[in-house]
């Protein structure tokens, strides 16, 4: 016989036999109450067939001496358990009461094997110590600010002096709907949304700590069931452990409000790869977070560089390694370069030449087609799940993500535009639960059909119809992809001040296009050093101009990461290298370059450059002899013919120099176009100029 028991702790199912005694039946009912919940007072326990006072209530002690069979229950009956929580014993655990101002959750009772406390109720999250959560600096900054929107005195409505204030000029809250509408702000900033959630709470320090305002969405079945009244899913499921239905709406806030690219060369680097190969490219954005003043309590991401992972580009897509094997190393190097620098997002190309004019790009992402496809949205959500935001405003210690996605695609004028977005928090939950999948139509998302051992909750989406009424529609089998993301604005600074000044070094993981190697490092560094007569191996003799050129050459993200990953520098020297590469952005760090020049890794690099330059000098003839071998006067000795500039005489001579006699049938090299003339004339067969110069 199956009986359902509904209590303040939830609904549970019990399987009993007609011969089960009343004492065993009462104990089974008590076992459905999780130990983490307030325990009932035995004197107040009562069982009823109707909720509240509407039905007949039977106290628990009346069950003694009886069996379930003679209580009149039928299979599937719903019974209601009522009780009052047991009052805490003031004499018990005095030390706990003295140090803990708030009640602590009860610990699991080992005598009850069916008691589970993770979590105690459906859609709740276990409490954890949030004091150890390290929040980003930008979040710490906005938490200390009032966020009020200052307004000036309104000359039309204000009837007071300059030092007074009224309803027409008092500061507004950062979530003020009228201000949001007047300034066409579609999404609240993250911290403005938090202020809105906390506005109804008392302004105490403990209210935000004890009751975090954000609750991460969970669409997975809770296993094991908190009640412990049935086997774990898929063998059993109840209203306590199954996820609730979800209604999708446009997310009212966004975690990032703006993306700022520090330099146009960041975008140009990706475009140049596409122009040269015709295949798509993807890269991860390296940047930091900062305040954004154009929206109340706004946050922007400043992109300083990109890192291209191992990938195989195609004409209409690409294949990229997952997971990204070098991410932890890149994160470490970025942190050394600048405080707060990390992986903040990804960017990829979706460019197709126009069939009518190959100099223009095809405009395929617009209001009549789609902005982001369902496959792209699932990819964005997956990367956001792997880069959660640490915050004390969520009971789990993290909420959503600030990982952004950018796409380079064609615009209506045939140029290239940037589209930027983030997957919503609901999209992350749906991807994590595995209840959605991509569709052939890029503008819609499919809700998966549950397979064996799977559970997919009901999904709806809400919108306003043509009459302005809010309508709820089932999302199965498909729903628009717009419900799963929020748009983000982007731009470039008016006065660029990038962290990395150079981009001369080749980009990583571009086989066949250009490769990174130590030979490229040696060649580029030697080209800088050879412009001075100073000794290559002694950086102390370099003039200031050379040091400035080397410092600018080092300020290249791709060069820094390459040198750090080659093993030429020790761990400490790698940190010095990163400091030297960004020293121009930190005026107080004046000794980074000198420390690098004095390091062992740098001396080893200079030794290699010096030996390479010496080897090239021995293998290549001097410029003067090279010109003489061609029968041409060296530009360094231009002018009247002298003894030192005369061509070598003897049988090994190749030809006559400029100024030799015009007669004879020997080969003569034209001093203007270097063509070898075999006739005995005085003019060149190719350019027609005189062979005598």
UniProtKB/Swiss-Prot annotation:
Entries under Gene3D superfamilies matching the protein: Phosphatidylinositol 3-kinase Catalytic Subunit, Chain A, domain 1
Compositionally biased tracts (Low complexity): 644-655
GO MF assignments: ubiquitin binding; ubiquitin protein ligase binding
Keyword Membrane appears in the UniProt entry: yes
Pfam families: NPL4, zf-NPL4
Gene Ontology BP term (one): ubiquitin-dependent protein catabolic process
Keyword field: Cytoplasm, Endoplasmic reticulum, Membrane, mRNA transport, Nucleus, Protein transport, Translocation, Transport
Membrane topology type: Peripheral membrane protein
Biased composition (Polar residues): 613-631
Major localization listed first in the record, in broad terms: cytoplasm
Region of interest: Disordered: 85-132, 613-665
Residues in MPN domain copies: 259-399
Record GO cellular component, one term: nucleus
Subcellular location: Cytoplasm, Perinuclear region; Endoplasmic reticulum membrane; Nucleus membrane
Function as written in the Swiss-Prot or TrEMBL entry: Involved in the import of nuclear-targeted proteins into the nucleus and the export of poly(A) RNA out of the nucleus. Has a role in the endoplasmic reticulum-associated degradation (ERAD) pathway.
Homology family: Belongs to the NPL4 family.
Protein name per UniProt: Nuclear protein localization protein 4
Species: Cryptococcus neoformans var. neoformans serotype D (strain JEC21 / ATCC MYA-565) (Filobasidiella neoformans)
Gene: NPL4
């Amino acid at each position: 016989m199956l009986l359902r028991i509904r209590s303040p702790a939830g609904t549970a199912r019990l399987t009993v036999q007609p011969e089960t005694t009343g004492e065993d039946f009462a104990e089974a009912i008590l076992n459905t109450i999780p130990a983490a919940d307030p325990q009932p007072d035995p004197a107040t326990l009562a069982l009823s067939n109707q909720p509240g006072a509407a039905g007949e209530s039977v106290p628990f002690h009346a069950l003694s001496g009886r069996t379930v069979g003679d209580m009149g229950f039928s299979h599937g009956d719903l019974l209601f358990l009522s009780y009052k929580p047991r009052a805490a014993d003031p004499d018990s655990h005095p030390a706990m009461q003295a140090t803990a101002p708030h009640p602590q959750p009860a610990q699991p009772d080992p005598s009850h094997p069916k008691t589970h406390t993770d979590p105690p109720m459906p859609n709740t999250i276990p409490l954890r110590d949030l004091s150890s959560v390290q929040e980003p600096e930008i979040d710490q900054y906005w938490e200390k600010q009032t966020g009020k929107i200052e307004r000036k005195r309104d000359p039309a409505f204000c009837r007071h002096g300059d030092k007074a204030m009224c309803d027409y000029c008092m500061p507004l809250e950062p979530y003020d709907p009228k201000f949001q509408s007047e300034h066409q702000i579609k999404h609240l900033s993250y911290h403005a949304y938090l202020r809105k959630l906390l506005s109804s709470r008392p302004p105490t320090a403990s209210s935000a700590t004890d009751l975090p305002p954000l609750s991460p969405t969970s669409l997975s079945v809770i296993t094991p069931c908190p009640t412990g009244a049935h086997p774990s899913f898929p063998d059993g499921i109840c209203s306590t452990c199954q996820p609730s239905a979800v209604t999708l709406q446009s997310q009212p806030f966004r975690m990032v409000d703006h993306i700022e690219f520090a330099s146009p060369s960041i975008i140009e680097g990706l475009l140049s790869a596409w122009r040269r190969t015709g295949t798509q490219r993807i890269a991860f954005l390296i940047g930091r977070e900062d305040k954004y003043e154009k929206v109340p309590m706004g946050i922007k991401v400043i992109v300083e560089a990109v890192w291209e992972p191992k990938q195989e580009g195609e004409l209409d897509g690409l294949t990229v390694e997952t997971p990204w094997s070098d991410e932890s190393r890149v994160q470490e190097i970025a942190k050394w370069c600048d405080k707060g620098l990390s992986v903040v997002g990804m960017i990829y190309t979706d460019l197709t030449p126009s069939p009518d004019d190959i100099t223009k790009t095809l405009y395929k992402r617009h209001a009549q087609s789609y902005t982001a496809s369902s496959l792209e949205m699932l990819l964005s959500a997956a990367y956001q799940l792997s880069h959660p935001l640490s915050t004390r405003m969520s009971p789990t210690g993290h909420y959503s993500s600030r990982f952004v996605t950018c796409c380079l695609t064609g615009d209506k004028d045939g140029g290239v535009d940037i589209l930027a977005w983030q997957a919503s928090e609901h999209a992350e939950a749906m991807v994590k639960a595995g209840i959605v999948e991509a569709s052939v139509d890029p503008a819609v998302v499919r809700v998966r059909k549950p397979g064996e051992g799977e559970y997919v909750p009901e999904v709806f989406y809400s919108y306003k119809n043509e009459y302005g009424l809010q309508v709820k529609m089932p999302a199965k089998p498909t729903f628009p992809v717009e419900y799963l993301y929020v748009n983000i604005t982007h731009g470039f600074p008016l006065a660029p001040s990038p962290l990395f000044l150079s981009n001369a070094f080749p980009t990583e993981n571009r086989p066949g296009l250009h490769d990174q190697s130590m030979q490229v490092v040696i060649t580029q560094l030697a080209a800088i050093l050879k412009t001075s007569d100073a000794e290559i191996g002694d950086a102390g003799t370099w003039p200031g101009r050379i040091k400035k050129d080397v410092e600018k050459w080092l300020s290249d993200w791709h060069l820094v990461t390459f040198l750090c990953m080659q093993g030429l520098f020790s761990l400490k020297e790698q940190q010095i290298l990163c400091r030297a590469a960004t020293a121009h952005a930190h005026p107080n760090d004046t000794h980074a370059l000198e420390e690098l020049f004095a390091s062992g890794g740098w001396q080893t690099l200079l030794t290699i450059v010096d030996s390479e330059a010496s080897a090239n000098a021995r293998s290549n003839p001097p410029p003067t002899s090279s010109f003489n071998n061609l029968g041409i006067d060296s530009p360094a000795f231009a002018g009247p013919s002298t003894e030192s500039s005369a061509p070598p005489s003897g049988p090994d001579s190749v030809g006559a120099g400029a100024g030799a006699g015009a007669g004879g049938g020997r080969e003569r090299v034209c001093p203007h176009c270097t063509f070898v003339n075999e006739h005995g004339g005085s003019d060149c067969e190719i350019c027609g100029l005189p062979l005598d110069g």
